[in-house]
């Protein structure tokens, strides 16, 4: 059985062209989503996937109607293949029921994986180059090393943490991370009380 799936794009909010192509291709049932592909919750696609059984074929007008990204698309088609369901894209001439269609999809998967690895490699190389130039990624530190040391001295003098946090305009939790409280245990009636110092 051929099951169709249509989804609007951000440019074209009309699915008539897709629907007509799927009807001409022989789809007996067509499921539709009227939302952008970036949304993860697509009830029409979920219903189509539930309806599909072993030996069926999921048909779309174009690849980008099904997947949000190449990685998502390859994952979805892999799940279909595991369930014994074929996939067909009309405008891209992809049909995983044929050996050539399966080969083409494997090549696409390998290219997507290679692209992902290249992005990771370039990112890591860029970060290493920045570190070698003395740049550290992320937000600049709130306080200098000298300011943190001064905050520690104020705490050692007995100034309350809340007051020190206000003076340096830092969160109390940040102050605790930089200068953890010293704990003293006092035994009292078989309980242990902890007192911050």
From Swiss-Prot:
The keyword Ligase appears for this protein: yes
Subcellular location: Host cytoplasm
Keyword annotations from UniProtKB, A to Z: DNA integration, DNA invertase, DNA recombination, DNA-binding, Host cytoplasm, Hydrolase, Late protein, Ligase
Active site: 9 (o-(5'-phospho-dna)-serine intermediate)
Record carries keyword Cell division: no
Domain of life where this protein originates: Viruses
A molecular function (GO) term: hydrolase activity
Resolvase/invertase-type recombinase catalytic domain segment(s): 1-134
Induction behaviour: Expressed in the late phase of the viral replicative cycle. Expression of late genes is activated by the viral late transcription activator C.
EC number per UniProt: 3.1.22.-, 6.5.1.-
Gene Ontology terms: cellular component: host cell cytoplasm
Residues of the DNA-binding region: 138-181
Cystine crosslinks: none
GO process annotations (BP): DNA integration
InterPro entries documented for this protein: Homeodomain-like_sf (IPR009057), Recombinase_CS (IPR006118), Resolv_N (IPR006119), Resolvase-like_N_sf (IPR036162), Resolvase_HTH_dom (IPR006120), SSR_resolvase (IPR050639)
Family, as annotated: Belongs to the site-specific recombinase resolvase family.
Role description: Performs inversion of a viral segment (G-segment) that encodes two alternate pairs of tail fiber proteins thereby modifying the host specificity of the virus. Binds as a dimer to the viral gix sites which are 34-bp palindromic sequences that flank the invertible G-segment. Catalyzes site-specific recombination in the presence of the host factor Fis. Gin dimers bound to each of the gix sites and host factor Fis bound to the enhancer come together to form the synaptic complex.
Quaternary structure and partners: Homodimer. During inversion, two dimers associate to form a homotetramer.
Domain writeup: The dimerization region is in the N-terminus.
Protein's name in the database: Serine recombinase gin
Organism annotation: Escherichia phage D108
Organism ancestry: Viruses, Duplodnaviria, Heunggongvirae, Uroviricota, Caudoviricetes
């Amino acid at each position: 059985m051929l099951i169709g799936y249509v989804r609007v794009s951000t440019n074209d909010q009309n699915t008539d062209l897709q629907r007509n192509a799927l009807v001409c291709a022989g789809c007996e049932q067509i499921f539709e989503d009227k939302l952008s592909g970036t949304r993860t919750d697509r009830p029409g696609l979920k219903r189509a996937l539930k309806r599909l059984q072993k030996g069926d074929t999921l048909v779309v007008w174009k690849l980008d109607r099904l997947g949000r990204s190449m990685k998502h698309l390859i994952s979805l088609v892999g799940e279909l293949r595991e369930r014994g369901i074929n996939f067909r894209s009309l405008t891209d001439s992809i049909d995983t029921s044929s050996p050539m269609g399966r080969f083409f999809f494997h090549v696409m998967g390998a290219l997507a994986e290679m692209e992902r690895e290249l992005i990771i490699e370039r990112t890591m190389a860029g970060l290493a180059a920045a570190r070698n130039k003395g740049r550290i990624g992320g937000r600049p530190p709130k306080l200098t090393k000298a300011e943190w040391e001064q905050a520690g001295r104020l705490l050692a003098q007995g100034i309350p943490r809340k007051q020190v946090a206000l003076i340096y305009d830092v969160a109390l939790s940040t102050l605790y991370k930089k200068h953890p409280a010293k704990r003293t245990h006092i035994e009292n009636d078989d309980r242990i009380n902890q007192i911050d110092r």
